[in-house]
Amino acid sequence: SLLKPYMSLPENVDSLIFRRGGELSGEFNELYNALFNKADRYINLVKLLSTRREGFTRKEIEATTGYSGGSLTKMLDNLERCDFTVSYSQFGNKSKLTLYRLADFFTLFYFRYVENNRSRDDQYWQHHFMDRSVESWEGFSFEEICLRHLPHIKQGLGISGIATESSAWRFIPQKGDERKGTQVDLVIKRVDKIVHLVEMKFSESPYTISKEYEEKLKSRRNLFMEMTGIKRGVVITFVTPAGVSHGLHSSIVHSQLAAKHLFADILEKTISL
């Protein structure tokens, strides 16, 4: 392992990535050049994908990059085979609306904190890991972990034996529509006609739902039902590290899971040892 046990995590990150000559300071370009011919095209593509958490449709990728046809198909396939990206359907399962999302943590971290870092500060991460931007990074990372543990989410909800379809949903208002755009990064549609709108929220303590956020959740659920034509059975599920705090506005939560559900297999093995 490159991690040094006598160092804290921020110290290790600085030593590996931000220190000049660090073992991973040049890893990004070396990695892409080692894996792909015409690596610059792949880097341009993943850089675009890094700018939108929910991902891009192929049409959006073509319009922005100018890549198209078989060469774009090959690039998207190669990136997914190497686990840099994931593709998933939008609710309704229309293949033309497939979303391509950047899922590699190192690539995401590179574009967010390394590529444009001109500070030349060998202790950059120690000086900035408590910044607000890192809080949003923690939230994004937690969402990505949740999406990679979908079978555990189903298991925690007690629906492992029920046929389901997992997708994303987003609403983009047309010109003249005053409603705001919104999205749900994980929608689980069950064969028994229950639909889970899954909220994945990072918090070091039990997550507290405010009055404003409760209203936002209600509005989003109503919009989802209106746009999809689903009349009933749409419920809100939360996945958080430590659960949802019981309060005045928590009744909107139909079901909730915590980190222990995402890592149930590991915890069981640890206990058995």
Where are these regions (language model features)?
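Amphipathic alpha-helical "lid/sensor" segments that cap RecA-like P-loop NTPase cores
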Residues: 1-26
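Short amphipathic alpha-helical interface segments
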Residues: 37-54
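A short acidic, leucine-rich amphipathic alpha-helix
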Residues: 45, 57-64
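Short amphipathic alpha-helical interaction segments
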Residues: 65-82
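A cross-kingdom feature that marks ATP-driven nucleic-acid transaction machinery
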Residues: 91, 98-273
